[in-house]
Amino acid sequence: MPAPLPPSTTPPPRRLEPGRAVLFMAAATALFAGTTLLAKALGTDALGPPLHPFQVSFGRFLFAWVAILMVAAVLRPPMGRPALGLHLGRTLCGWGGATLMFAAAARMPLTDATALSFLSPVLTMLLAIPLLGERVGPWRWAAVAIALVGAMILLRPGPGTFQIAGLLALGAALALGLEAILIKRLTNREAPVPVLVINNGMGVAIALGPALAVWLAPTPAQWLALVGVGVVMVAGQLLFLLAVGRADASFVAPLFYLTLVYATVYDLAVFGVLPDAVSLVGAVVLVSGALLLALREGRRR
């Protein structure tokens, strides 16, 4: 699940409206889970012959770019002077994370894939130590340990049970963690909409070559799903920005874990997959660690 912009990258709210923030986050997380659902449908035979994750991620960036260009045409935000090096690094990480996440979602339950993606903020914290020089206290280390235990439960280590798909999801979380570091640097100097315009435009250029190498003509239903992956992701990101503009980041961040609830419901409704005990325990443990980290970050701010 491609992650939205982190709460710390948006300006402080002018007027606190927590009720509206909850509604915006409920809608945003439903859409974020929806992108993973669409990616799973595209990567399986639900809508036709399975499409390669390279092709799915290309569709995600292409149609997200079209959508955000339409938003930019209406809002007309000043573009300024973009830091192209940071944008390139951020986009490479985002493309890698999206591709790995789409591959994982096609091979494992949405609940497991979504829960493993919540390692992203934990890995961001770990990466911030060498890359941003941040100091980490005992509570944050405890949150990391709890989240990693949950991840190991979800990976089901043991003879014949270790999930390769889980490693793909872990790789996605690592790539998205690196992306979050670069996003923090970018949005300290650039506005969110121009960042999304440049990011998705670069993503199209990066994803085009790999997609052409594995291209399979999509069915009409798959074309609609490819459009949906991009448009739904952008809509979710914009709703997320509306949420963090109406409440403190520490209030909004824990609501992001509603994504896991939606993913579970979608997987059951569309694919008939009900999480087993291992999935539920692992998800609860991992989310507990990530939630502890989010709450501690909120107090620090």
Segments the model singles out, each with a brief description of its role:
Residues F63-A67, L116-P130, A145, G201-I206, ...:
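Alpha-helical transmembrane segments of compact multi-pass small-molecule transporters, enriched
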Residues T114-L119, L186-M202, Q237-L268:
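Helix-helix packing/entry segments at the starts of transmembrane helices
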Residues P2-L5, R20, P49-G96, A175-L178, ...:
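Transmembrane alpha-helices of multi-pass small-molecule transport proteins
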Residues M101-A106, P121-A142, V214, V261-L280:
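C-terminal transmembrane-helix exit sites in multi-pass transporters
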Residues L31-L62, L178-M202:
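Juxtamembrane helix-loop-helix junctions in multi-pass membrane proteins
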Residues R20-A28, A72-M101, I164-A172, A217-A235:
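Loop-to-transmembrane-helix transition segments
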Residues I68, W139-R156, V278-E297:
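Hydrophobic transmembrane alpha-helices of multi-pass small-molecule transport proteins
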